[in-house]
Amino acid sequence: MIGAPCVVDTRGTWHYRRKQMKKRVVVVGAGLCGSLLSTLLRNDFEVTIVEQGRTKRPLFNDVECKTGELNTSINRGEGLGGTSNYWHNALIELDDDDLEKAGIEPRGFAPYYAKAWSLFLAQAELDECARARDANRASVGGGTATVAHMVLPQTRHNMWKLANERYPGDSIKIVYGHAQKIAPGYVEVKGRNGVERLDADYVIASAGGLATPVLLARSLGQDDAFCAGYHDHPMAYIAKVKLRPDSRLKAASCTTTRSAEVRAGLTYKTAGLKTVIYLRPAIDMRLGSITGPARYILSDLRNDPFSPKKILMLLGNLEAVREAILFKTRQGFRGDYYSVLILGEQTPIKTRGIQLSPGKRPSLNWQVTAEELASYDRSVNAFFDEYASEIVERKALPSAEWTFRNAAHHSGTANQFVAAPGDTTPEFFRATGLPGTFVCDGSLLRAAGIANSGLTLVALGYRLADQMRSMA
């Protein structure tokens, strides 16, 4: 268990009875949302959290998917903290338009975004990032593109450890195993010693955008369900550019503060879909470093640092080595050469999602449609047109040769299991047909624009915790 030690104190019998009177919450999944929610609720409920395994390890074979490097890069994780064991949380808000598409009223949600920012950065650090944001918008804003504000903290946090540091309190029981089914009053968990029933007044499904819909479907007896509505942010390196020595794009691409990097994303909307463009440091105009499996080797090796194969790949991509040094030494981006990285918006469609089959692993279809590709291509051309005077030279891959990778934001797959009330009321989180069950992870998001979903999910965690305290 995690929390205050069991000692006899002046509270004595009263303290024991208070604990016995608490309602029981079972949280499935100890990743981003599950870790936060379990700590926020620990003093009001008797909290149990279910995590697949004790050992931190990536998951590569729990889902069938042949595209987008879904099963060759780390984007699902086992162990307390989930994928936060591997990834920095790049912090970016959904804009008002995207919040409304996601069923979230923007003004009422603003205080929860503020709480989410404060979980990761102190107020002085946030003020410094805000000054960089304003400078970026003054420098490169005002044209066709809107300027997205992304903050990448220097410190990578395991969410389980961070949440427990921020919100200590009563004990949390940890159960290791696979949640098999949610039923009225309990959760079935299969562990080393067989199937265990965990009594629950309330259940929070926070197993992640690929696992939560599978759990919900199987709990409802839908063993062959298709969980539609999946969307992510297809990402691809598509070009290299040489900028003018005095180009305003240089500072906006990366501003270094004492505790973070602030990166301005240039966002275009074409045919109803957004595309965001980020510039990353390069050495020259050769395209070899942004094609093939070595193009993301920096993040792949960071999460698997002892792989001989990946070490050799890194040594073959000096641009990745240089970028790592710039990040660690807080020098920002340097030089005239940059790679162009895009992330595209996907919207929920009926043919994209997770297919369940009895006795088999779930399979994911997340392909980029022809319409999406055409939209991204037009947005890239708009970027090159708008900033033509900043670019001395460019080499671009044709859109037919763009190789997309999944950005691991796995969203939208629980939409058929939850209502759409138009705001974050309890019904927004409540799983239909499973009394006392709530959903809080990427599977809940109906839209995400071009924003990494992590900050929004943390804000939703704070919102759900506020609502559940009234149920204690």
Across the structure, where does each feature detected by a protein language model lie?
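Conserved redox-cofactor binding core of oxidoreductases
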Residues: I104-P184, E401-T403
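Mid-to-C-terminal "cap/lid" subdomains and adjacent gly/pro-rich loops that border
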Residues: L36-T39, S206, P213, A217-F333
